[in-house]
Design a protein with these regions (language model features):
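Nudix hydrolase/Nudix homology domain
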Residues: 4, 67-84, 135-207
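Short beta-strand scaffold segments in enzyme catalytic cores
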Residues: 11-19
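Conserved Nudix-box catalytic region and its N-terminal flanking loop in Nudix hydrolases
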Residues: 21-108
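Acidic, glycine-rich loop-and-strand cores that form catalytic or ligand-binding grooves
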Residues: 98-153
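Short, surface-exposed coil-to-beta transition loops
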Residues: 10-11, 139
């Protein structure tokens, strides 16, 4: 694959979970940073014919993740398809429950119940050169606000306050500074975390 002729897309969503004026973040072992809970959207089998026609190539070990190399000439049509929401995930429950109940198992799904998810900002396509991957890239991220009951808030607070989990609370100031104090050590917060502070609407369009 000639990287110069492709744009790497990673289409994802981040959860803005706010309790007592602080935001819930999770530790990323890969980067040793704290970041919002979130994940990559998946596309469905029904999208495969279009993606093949556009010349797209999977960029991840999971071939249905929307981490994908798109030929530059196909970017406008691919962006239109993303904005349509057709043949891909448009809900957020899967990643939330995977992170909170399956991978980490610090909460009981039967006791916790189902929170309310509201997308407050659409991701937008802004193509930039990624110095790490050495390729033109676009990382549209939807921001999803999670509304919790008082009981759900208390359950999460107990998990965080135990100090034995990958979760922490960070203030808006921490997030803007890009670092937070954890167990007496200053730990970086991922730069993309600032996006959960944004609530102004943006549409998924080609920038």
């Amino acid at each position: 694959m000639d990287k110069d002729k492709y744009v790497k897309f990673s289409v994802s969503y981040l959860f803005s979970i706010k309790i007592d004026d602080k935001y819930l973040l999770v530790h990323s072992r890969r980067k040793n940073t704290y970041q919002p809970i979130g994940g990559c959207y998946k596309f469905f089998d029904s999208a495969v014919p279009l993606l093949l026609k556009l010349g797209c190539i999977p960029a991840d070990k999971d071939p249905f993740d929307l981490r994908i190399f798109v030929p530059e000439a196909s970017v406008p049509e691919f962006s239109d398809w993303l904005a349509s929401g057709k043949d891909r995930e448009n809900t957020f429950e899967r990643e939330f429950f995977e992170e909170m109940f399956i991978e980490n198992k610090y909460l009981n799904i039967e006791d916790f119940g189902f929170p309310e998810f509201n997308k407050v900002q659409d991701g937008y396509v802004n193509i930039k050169y990624d110095d790490f991957y050495k390729i033109k890239s676009a990382y549209p991220m939807d921001i999803v606000s999670v509304t919790l009951s008082d009981s759900q808030k208390e359950q999460i607070k107990k998990v965080v306050e135990s100090g034995k989990t990958p979760f922490i609370f960070a203030t808006e100031s921490d997030i803007k500074k890009g670092e937070v104090l954890v167990n007496g050590k200053v730990v970086p917060i991922g730069s993309h975390t600032k996006k959960i502070l944004q609530t102004s609407p943006k549409s998924l369009v080609l920038a």
